[in-house]
Amino acid sequence: MAAQFYERNTSGMNADRFMTRLTDESTVNTMQRHYWTARQFIRTKLGKKEDEHLEASDNELDTCLNLYRSVHGTSFQLLNNVDNYANFLLDETLVQNVLGKYLKEKGKIDKTEAVGRILIAVGRSLLFSSHRLNAARIGVSTFYNKLSVFVERAIGDCSQTIEAVQMCRTEYRGSLLWMKKTSEELDPEVDGSMEKFREAQTTVKSNKERLDRLKTDTLQKVDLLSASRSNLLSYVLTHYQNELYEYYSKTSRAFETLAENINCYNNYDFEILSHLATGTKPERERKSEKEESAKTSQPRGNEEELKNLLFGRESPQFGEEEVQDESRSQCDSPLIEDVDDERRKTGDLLDLESAASIAFPIGPLATLFDTSSFVPPILPPPKPNAVSDDILSLFDGNKANSSGKEASATTMDWQSLIDGFDRENEDNLL
């Protein structure tokens, strides 16, 4: 069985715990023991290296202490996170409840019958979601209470044992230093040297016995602490997981029923705020196919109860009205009209007005060119022999007159042709 506890036959108070030690030891031995304990404590704080054999004997205890520190730190972190999560769930529940009541009140006073029913339905769905979320929040609160009790009692009790075993190990190592010092100064011929060594040896033995008992208690308590926390988490989180799954399943079915009932109403197209259009909706055929595939993958239950809960007697007949197929896409907001359609309409109107203002002639088209008109031939280029290299030939009057007559005749032929072409074009245009 487990070893006796280190506070056996005592009331647990500090004065009663050390009463036997005060009566058995002398004042000098007590002062020496405290001196070597303080010296060992200072060595530990300064990071002095201990004997490797002494450290190897405490490997199991060090592993147990590391496990305790991990359980202690993670438990406090988990407690803080669960507290924050419970507060966030409470805020979300209150927001959904207030928003649901607000939508119900506005739906009752709305002048449009369809919009009023939709607002009432959405408000009821939000109230239903807030009630289910509040039920899931109760599980989180229960988890927080049980975890706080575990941290306060189990970890608090184990921390006392950890502190005791660490203090006892410091005293034991300090007594070893004391015995090492007395053994180096041991001289059988000197009076009182053997008594000092026996006192140090007795202190080492008593500290070793206490340390062994505390090691056993520490190992058992830390193992039990880790196992108890695992059992607590598995038990509480299983209930929370079931409540969370029930919340999501019921709220999802409620919102699916709400969407089905809202789709029965006709959409309203407004001609304002068209400049805010940012995108288009998917086609109704694709949307209906996706909804049907999602419906077939998840079975439904108690749809009539959810309809009655959300809509009451104001629920429209779902399934009787079929939505007409629309080839064109609609904008995301019901208050926004498609910008492309509006531009196309305005462009068509402008084209019609400009076309109506132009008077087109009725009858056969007029001819633009007369194929029977005379086209003068192009004169061949001058021969190289016609040009004389002699400068005196330029002053020849006969040749100059003949070339001038030919150039003037060619110019007159081209001028008459251009004038005749301009007259024909003017007649056709008139």
UniProtKB/Swiss-Prot annotation:
- Please summarize what the entry says happens upon disruption of the gene: Mutants are resistant to aldicarb, an inhibitor of acetylcholinesterase.
Q: What is its main location?
A: cytoplasm
Read off the PROSITE patterns from this record.
Answer: AH (PS50870)
Which residue ranges have biased composition labelled Basic and acidic residues?
281-294
| Signal peptide boundaries | none
**What are the recorded Gene Ontology BP terms?**
dense core granule maturation; neurotransmitter transport; regulation of locomotion involved in locomotory behavior; regulation of neurotransmitter secretion; regulation of transport
Recorded topology in the membrane: Peripheral membrane protein
Please provide the record's keywords in A-Z order: Cytoplasm, Cytoplasmic vesicle, Membrane, Neurotransmitter transport, Transport
**What are the GO cellular component annotations?**
cytoplasm; cytoplasmic vesicle membrane; Golgi apparatus
Localization recorded for this chain is: Cytoplasm; Cytoplasmic vesicle membrane
- GO molecular-function terms, A-Z: protein domain specific binding; small GTPase binding
Q: Where is this region: Disordered?
A: 279-342
Q: In which tissues is it expressed?
A: Expressed in all neurons. Highly expressed in m2 pharyngeal neurons and some pharyngeal interneurons. Also expressed in the excretory canal and the gland cells located just below the nerve ring in the head.
AH domain ranges (all copies) = 56-260
The family database entries (PANTHER family) matched by this protein are listed as: GH23156P (PTHR10164:SF4), ISLET CELL AUTOANTIGEN 1 (PTHR10164)
* Function summary: May be involved in neurotransmitter secretion. In association with the GTPase activator protein tbc-8 activates rab-2 during dense core vesicle maturation in cholinergic motoneurons.
Question: What is its quaternary makeup?
Answer: Interacts with the GTPase activator protein tbc-8; the interaction is direct and may be required for the activation of rab-2 and dense vesicle maturation in cholinergic motoneurons. Interacts with rund-1.
Q: What name has this protein been given in UniProt?
A: Resistance to inhibitors of cholinesterase protein 19
Chain's gene name? ric-19
